[in-house]
Design a protein with these regions (language model features):
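Oxyanion-binding and handling regions
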Residues: 1-33
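Conserved hydrophobic/aromatic beta-strand scaffold that supports enzyme active sites
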Residues: 5-7, 76, 176
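Acetyl-CoA-dependent GNAT
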Residues: 40-112, 116-129, 159-162, 178-188
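Short amphipathic helical patch at the helix-1/turn junction of helix-turn-helix
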Residues: 105, 139-140
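Short glycine/proline-centered loop/turn elements that form peptide/ligand docking sites
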Residues: 119, 142-145, 162-168
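Structural motif
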Residues: 129, 147, 151-152
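Conserved catalytic-core motifs of GNAT/GCN5-like acyltransferases
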Residues: 135-137, 150, 155-176
Length: 188
């Protein structure tokens, strides 16, 4: 048998992917680190979803907007951490593309990979529906969101003039961004 360092023999170092699968590390810390799997949003989630949306958006969706999205059958998911709402996303499946209508993560949980997890989930749902890509709009003034989407492979494909409400009754353009995803069973 070849000699190997202790950290290799005893597997004390783990990759991020291994840690997210629950391997290695302090077992008491695992529940706090594991982001969980998005679950379908229900009417019972709406109070928390509306509160989170109001906390993170300058011009938030209303309870009626969320209820209408659920009633229309849009893909709507919540992500919980230790029973508490951490984030959510809503996607409308069009004939050729999934349209990400809204995505949000609790500000206290930013920079922990939860937004990426939700975005990956939306992309996976698009693949499973046989769609070619995910489309979204984002405010140009939201530089952190624009950067986030670019880091995740989204490209700007257009601009929607006057799309968003803005301060003092004005309007703000939207950057239209899209990422192509291979449909489930298709060659990437």
């Amino acid at each position: 048998e070849l000699a190997a360092p202790l950290y290799v023999r005893d597997k004390v170092a783990f990759t991020t992917a291994e840690r997210l699968r629950g391997e290695g590390g302090n077992p008491k810390a695992r529940p706090a680190l594991a982001p969980g799997v998005p679950q379908p949003m229900t009417d019972a989630d709406l109070d928390e979803v509306v509160a989170l949306e109001a906390h993170v958006q300058a011009f938030p969706w209303t309870r009626g907007n969320f209820a209408d999205a659920l009633a229309a059958g849009y893909g709507a998911w919540v992500l919980r951490r230790e029973g508490r709402l951490a984030g959510f996303c809503i996607v409308m499946h069009a004939p050729d593309v999934a349209h990400l209508l809204v995505i949000a993560v609790d500000k206290a949980l930013h920079r922990q990979g939860l937004g990426g997890l939700l975005l990956d989930w939306c992309e996976q749902q698009a693949r499973e529906h046989g769609l070619e890509g995910v489309l979204l709009e984002v405010r140009p003034s939201n530089a952190s969101a624009v950067s986030f989407y670019k880091r995740h492979g989204y490209l700007q494909i257009g601009v929607r003039r006057g799309y968003y409400p803005a301060e003092k009754g004005g309007r703000e353009d939207a950057l239209v961004m899209q990422k192509r995803v291979a449909a489930a069973g298709a060659a990437a």
